[in-house]
Regions:
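Low-complexity, polar-biased intrinsically disordered regions enriched in Pro/Ser/Thr/Gly
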Residues: 110-111, 126-132, 236-245, 267, ...
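Basic- and hydrophobic-enriched, low-structure N-terminal and domain-boundary segments
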Residues: 1-151, 155-163, 168-170, 486, ...
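Short alpha-helix boundary/capping motifs
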Residues: 1, 361, 459-460, 491, ...
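P-loop NTPase motor domains
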Residues: 24, 126, 133-436, 451, ...
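General helical secondary-structure elements
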Residues: 4, 72, 247, 514, ...
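Conserved ATP-driven motor cores of ASCE-family P-loop NTPases powering translocation/secretion/packaging/pilus
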Residues: 428-530
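A short glycine-/small-residue-rich loop at the edge of a beta-strand within enzyme catalytic domains
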Residues: 104-111, 379, 415, 471
Length: 593
């Protein structure tokens, strides 16, 4: 038994032991009292009590000890029954116990070293470690940030956490959604100074972008299905519904074609440009069911060589459609893949430079630049996130025993604009153990519900940290006010009656009041924010001052000379270092092509 438990038991039962020992003297007095009748005993007891208690030591006679035991146990039983039947009062908390958090509340969740934390507010931080000294203080690193336009989501949350790039104990890779293309410019040099490898994918100007080929990350039949699901989920268009038959038919065709490219085509042809070329050659004859286009012949030949091929099996299911139906399916597929027909997009997806599967191996910062006014190419960003989560989870499980060596933090600004990430509600619940975290940044909570419907609550429930930077959207204010709870306040009412019989009185009562009502949240000071951390009282704090960050001096906000020229950075030539290793190949000895 621990010393703490022993001390607690002694403090609880020692008084009753003392009472029992004293009561042994009462037993001695009763034993010494003369008389056989009860009345005579009681009269004589008055004479023997002084003599019995004159000796401070307890009596050890069996009868006396029995009396002492009964008295001690009886007193303990009486106290227990009184406590059990007592009325339960919560003074000062009759209508609610809500209050604001204090520095003492957040202290167990913060790492001593500033660089080893996620910055939440000016005074509150969350340790990067998933294994704190006390396991009860473990929290996932998923964060939900809600703030209206101009509330400082980028300045007060994304930039400060991007500058947390100098931790030696907990190295971090970043994946940053950059709606305006400014974050990489302003913070890129700071990351380079701390040994980061920078990558950019730009859907606003593809000529200033690195290449991203979704097919480069296909390693199995499951990956083909995941890619097609991500593509179709984010190219639905607004307000589309109708018969699911067409979606299922399109899925069969796309899966079969992509599987064919992956398993049969040369690596340089495994891209969407080749996929479109295949679709363009798939003419269908409505009158002649025996007509075969070039793609039909490819699959027929493959079926003879590999009859159990995944691509062949899927294509045979597609070919069950009649000529007219098949033509409609082809038209739907062509419309869905129309963005890949643009030459810039073809070039940007021809091969891959992003190396998504290596984000957890070394310190890397990937900036995903997208338009916040035109969502035409945002589906590419969503596909990147979908593949990224799946690739990193698989790599953590298969190569690193379930935990990546470098934590990958996704700072997803304007989360509602990138489209739907398939299975996000499941991913946010499982990525924590793999050293991956997602920080969703929204203008209102209703944006999340509009995209993820009933799964929005599941996503929010897996965000252990939630920050409100300000806003006026009614649903957000209502939900936050209810989550903060009610506190108990004191109310005085003065009454003054005038007339022939004037009277004056004061009435005191307790009332329940929201910690912050909706109207108070709507006029929240621009420099304040509200932090909710699971299992802890909410905090009303100042927003983090970016200028106070130790790495602020490396940003272009501090000195315009620190601005990173992305185009120049992408076009730079790799420098050869003295310790680089090369393989020398004699070109004359190579076999002819």
């Amino acid at each position: 038994m621990s010393k703490k438990k022993l001390s607690k038991l002694l403090a609880l039962y020692l008084p009753y032991v003392v009472i029992g020992l004293l009561a042994t003297n009462l037993g001695e007095a009763w034993r010494l009292a003369a008389g056989k009748e009860l009345g005579d005993k009681i009269v004589s007891l008055m004479d023997t009590l002084p003599a019995a208690f004159s000796n401070p030591l307890p009596s050890l006679r069996p009868f006396d000890l029995f009396i002492g035991l009964c008295c001690g146990a009886g007193m303990r039983l009486a106290v227990y029954l009184k406590g059990k039947n007592a009325k339960k009062y919560r003074h000062g908390m009759e209508y609610g116990s809500a209050r604001w958090g204090t520095p003492k509340d957040i202290e167990p969740f913060m790492a001593p070293k500033f660089a080893d934390n996620i910055i939440l507010t000016k005074t509150e931080r969350l340790m990067m470690s998933n294994r704190p000294p006390d396991p009860k203080n473990a929290r996932n690193k998923n964060v939900l940030v809600v703030g209206g336009s101009g509330s400082g989501k980028t300045r007060f949350f994304i930039k400060p956490n991007l500058l947390q790039c100098d931790s030696k104990n907990f190295p971090v890779s970043f994946v940053v959604t950059d709606p305006k293309g400014s974050i990489g410019v302003e913070c890129g040099e700071a990351l380079l100074k701390h040994g980061y490898k920078l990558k950019f994918f730009n859907t606003i100007n593809f000529s200033k972008s690195m290449r991203y080929n979704p097919m480069a990350y296909i390693h199995s039949e499951k990956d083909v299905l995941k890619l097609v699901t991500a593509l179709m989920t984010n190219t639905k268009g607004e307000g589309q519904g109708g018969d699911p038959f067409w979606d299922k038919a399109e899925r069969l065709l796309l899966v079969s074609l992509i599987a064919y490219l992956h398993y049969e085509a040369p690596v340089e042809e495994q891209n969407f440009a080749t996929l479109l070329e295949m679709l363009n050659t798939m003419q269908v004859s409505e009158d002649d069911e025996t007509y075969q286009n070039p793609v039909d012949l490819l699959f027929e030949d493959l079926g003879k060589k590999k009859p159990k091929s995944f691509a062949v099996r899927q294509y045979k299911l597609y070919k069950l459609a009649a000529g007219k139906t098949a033509k409609s399916i082809l038209i739907s597929c062509g419309a869905r893949l129309a963005p890949f027909d643009i030459q810039e997009v073809r070039d940007a997806t021809m091969y891959d430079e992003l190396e998504l599967d290596k984000l957890g191996d070394r310190k890397t910062a990937l900036f995903l630049i997208m338009s916040d006014t035109d969502s035409t190419f945002n589906f590419l960003i969503s596909m990147i996130y979908t593949q990224l989560f799946n690739l990193l989870c698989d790599k953590a499980d298969d190569q690193y025993g379930g935990k990546l060596p470098v934590h990958v933090r996704c700072l997803i600004d304007e989360c509602a604009n990138i489209g739907q990430i398939p299975q996000l509600e499941k991913l946010v619940a499982t990525i924590r153990s793999r050293e991956i975290s997602a920080c969703l940044v929204l203008q209102t909570r209703s944006q999340l519900k509009a995209i993820y419907k009933d799964n929005a609550d599941t996503i929010v429930g897996n965000m252990d940290s939630q920050i409100f930077l300000g806003g006026s959207e009614p649903t957000t204010l209502k939900e936050l006010s209810e989550a903060l709870g009610k506190e108990t306040i004191d109310s005085y009412n003065n009454s003054d009656t005038r007339g022939n019989s004037p009277s004056y009185g004061t009435n005191y009562q307790k009332l329940g009041h929201e910690l912050m009502s909706r109207d108070e949240l709507a006029v929240l000071d621009g420099g304040k924010c509200i932090l909710q951390l699971r299992g802890v009282r909410p905090f009303l704090s100042d927003k983090y001052d970016l200028t106070q960050h130790p790495n602020y001096k490396y940003t272009s906000d501090y000195d315009p000379k620190n601005a990173l020229d992305i185009e120049k950075f992408l076009n730079r030539k790799e420098k050869i270092h003295p310790d680089d290793t090369f393989i020398m190949v004699d070109a004359d000895s190579l076999p002819p092509a």
